[in-house]
Amino acid sequence: MKRADVLATLEMVASDQWGIVTTGQAGREGIERLQLSRLAERGDLDRARHGVYLLPSHQGGPHDEIRAAWLSLEPKKFIDERWEDEQPVVVSHESAALIHGIGRLVPPNLTLSTEGTKQTRQQGVRIHTRRDFPEEDIVSVDGLPVTSVALTVGDLAEAKIERGYLADLVADALRKEGVRIDDLASKLAPSARYYEAKSGKQLVAELSAEASSVEDRTEWINRLALVPRIINARAEEQLKRWDPDARIWR
C-alpha cells in the first residue's frame, strides 16, 4: 500500500475519533506497525502515546491525552464498537469534571470507570472497576463516553474531596443545561453525612450558598483592587488640566 493510500485509510478510520488512531485499528485495515513507525519518522504522524498516533487532520485540544488513553485501553476496537460494549470504559471522576468544565480540580491521573474488570499498565491512568451506573449516567461528549455531570459530582463527593472543591463543582454543575437539583441531590445523598448534612438536598443548598458567598467576596475584592487605579487615573487627568503658570485649572 502506497504512503498516500495508507494515510487516506488511516484518516477514514480516525474520522469519527478526533483524528486519532491506534496500531490495533490500523492492523485491522491491513496497515502494519512498521508502516506507522515510518510515517511517524517522516513527520506524517505524531505519537500520542504507545501505540496511538495523531493524524494530519487532528486538531489539538485539552482533552487529547484523555482521548488517546481511552482508545489505547481497547486498541483493536473502533469507537462505535466501544460504545456497544456491555461493560464500557468511561471517563469519570476528576477527568470527567475536566471534560465537563466544572470545578477547579487538577486531575493527578487520567481517571476512568467500568462496570466490569479492567487492568492497565499505563502510567498515570487509574480505572475504577465493578462500578454500577445506569445507562442514562453515561453521556457522550464529542463522542467520548463520560459519566454525567451529576454522577461526576457524586463520585468526587464519595472520594471525600475537600468541601471547597465540592462547592465549586456543585455551583458549576447547577449552571449546566439539563442538570436538575433533584438528580444532583440524589447523587450526593450517600456522602451527605460525611459533609455534615442531613440529606443530599441540604448538601446541595449549603454548598451552592458557600460557593456563591466565595464568588461574591472575590468579586468585591477585585472591585476594591480597582479603586486605587480609578483614583490615580482621575488625579492624572486633573493634573493635565492644571496650568502652573496661570495657577488655574483649565
Where are the model-predicted features located?
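Short gly/ser-rich loop at a beta-strand->alpha-helix junction or flexible surface loop bordering the NTP-binding
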Residues: 2-148, 155, 159-250
